[in-house]
Amino acid sequence: GSSGLIPMGRV
């Protein structure tokens, strides 16, 4: 994951 609309896990 990443910093998006829904950050899942790692940012």
From Swiss-Prot:
Transmembrane region(s): none
Protein name: Periviscerokinin-1
Presence of keyword NADP: no
Predominant subcellular localization, coarse grouping: secreted
Record's subcellular location: Secreted
Source organism (scientific name): Blattella germanica
An annotated GO cellular component: extracellular region
KW Secreted (keyword) present: yes
InterPro entries xref list: Periviscerokinin
Keywords in alphabetical order: Amidation, Neuropeptide, Secreted
